[in-house]
Structure formats: C-alpha cells, structure tokens
Regions:
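Signature of long, low-cysteine stretches enriched in small and polar/charged residues
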Residues: 61-64, 92-152
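Secretory targeting signatures
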Residues: 1-30
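Sequence contexts marking disulfide-bonded cysteines in secreted/extracellular proteins
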Residues: 84-86, 145-147, 167-169, 173-175
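Secretory pathway targeting signatures of secreted, lumenal, and periplasmic proteins
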Residues: 37-97, 127-137
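Ser/Thr/Pro/Gly-rich low-complexity linker/stalk segments immediately outside membranes or between
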Residues: 27-41
C-alpha cells in the first residue's frame, strides 16, 4: 500500500460509516440536579456512577466487539451514554478532527488524562428546515466525547443531550458538564483490556493498511503532511 490516495479513499469511506453510526445513536439527552439519585454501573471494561436514575440499553453486539460496547439512558431527563473500549480507538476522534471537530480540552481525573471533545448535531427526523422557528434550538443535540487512552487502548464515553433541558454552552463549566459529565468521568474505574478488539479489525483492514491510514491521519494533524499537495 504505497498510494496516499488510498488513504484518502479509506478516510472518506470511514467518515460515512462514522456519520451513520452517529445518526443511529444521537437521539437522547439528560438534565437533573445534584440532589437526584445516583446509579452505579459495572461493565466489562469500566465501572462508575451516574447522577440520576439510569438504565442499561440492550445492544446487539457482533463478533469481536461483543462486550466491549455499552449504552445507558436516563429516560427521565433524556440522556444517553454510549461507551466503548477499542485498541487504537483514538483513530476515530482523529478522523472526527479532520472533519472539523475542535481540539479537545484535557482534564486529569484520578491520575488519568481525559480528552474532552464537544460538538453538536441535529436529528434529521425531527427537523425539516434548519432555518425555521426559534424552537429549532430544542432540536440541537449537545455531544461530549470523553476519551482516555491507556496503553494504546481508547476508553470512550459518548454523551448526548437534547431538548436543552440542562444548560449547555459547549464548555466544561456549564451545568451539563459540571453536574453530570464531569462527576461521571471522575468516578470511572478502568479494567484490564488486553483482549479489547482492534480498530483495524472493526474497519476490515489489515494491520498494515490500518497503520498506513493512521500514520497518514497523524501526519495531517501534526502538520507533516499537506493533503492539498496530494497528486
């Protein structure tokens, strides 16, 4: 694999896959105060505590990913927490950044650095015209991606909140983050993940193909590769 064009094609295909996955999962939110109840969770790769009454969602895992993803919802406050543990999983957020996702904030909780990304989305099934009335703001989904990289493995919590039930300005100082996301991330206890699936396998790539694409994405992000000069 010696053509940079191959990398661009692979990234373009991956972007479509990522967008599709995001569209499937981006349909829930939360909002509660610190006096509400809390809910403990414990899965194959991490454990911790949510603020509020949260239930586990059923996931139809297939193949090597089975047990390495998890999902929870706070139905009272419209919130979804999607979790995953994948080797080289930071490749996904790197590609997100190529698509325009802003650089992450970095926070240290219990000795572990977390990268915190923020973005927004609008569910297509709820909006027919993005230029319509002032109620449109209620359709905006606030998305926080919290990622901890440990020995080449990404532990990721994707939090989605909609209907503006909890104030959010996209920072780490708004009620949405301070009351719900921050406390959750701070509570996380990691588990050994030597058998976590590899991103290469999930994308249907050989190790060589994945390394080529990852190196290429890394090069664009760190400025050593100029994609505009691709021939």
């Amino acid at each position: 694999m010696d053509s940079k064009k191959t990398a661009i094609i692979a990234i373009a295909v991956l972007a479509i896959v990522i967008s599709s996955l995001g569209a499937v999962s981006a349909f829930e939110l939360f909002g509660m105060n610190l006096f509400d109840s809390s809910t403990d969770f414990d899965n194959k790769f991490m454990s911790g505590t949510f603020n509020g009454e949260v239930i586990q969602n059923e996931i139809k895992d297939n193949g090597s990913i089975k047990g390495w993803t998890d999902s929870y919802s706070d139905n009272e406050n419209n919130i979804t927490y999607n979790m995953s543990c994948v080797k080289d999983g930071d490749f996904i957020t790197d590609v997100y950044q190529l698509q325009g996702l802003g650089a992450p904030e970095v926070r240290n909780y219990n000795g572990q650095a977390w990268k915190i990304f923020y973005s927004q989305a609008v569910p297509d099934n709820n909006v027919t015209d993005n230029k319509t009335s002032g109620n449109d703001t209620n359709n905006t989904i606030n998305v926080y991606i919290c990622e901890a990289d440990i020995n080449g493995t990404a532990y990721t919590i994707n939090v989605m909140s909609y209907e503006n039930k909890t104030e959010c300005d996209g920072t780490l100082f708004c009620p949405l983050y301070k009351e719900y996301i921050g406390p959750l991330v701070e509570s996380i206890q990691f588990k050994e993940a030597k058998k976590a699936p590899k991103m290469a396998d999930l994308l249907g790539m050989s190790d060589e193909e994945f390394k080529f694409n990852k190196d290429y994405v890394d090069g664009i992000l760190n400025g050593t590769i100029d994609p505009s000069k691709l021939q």
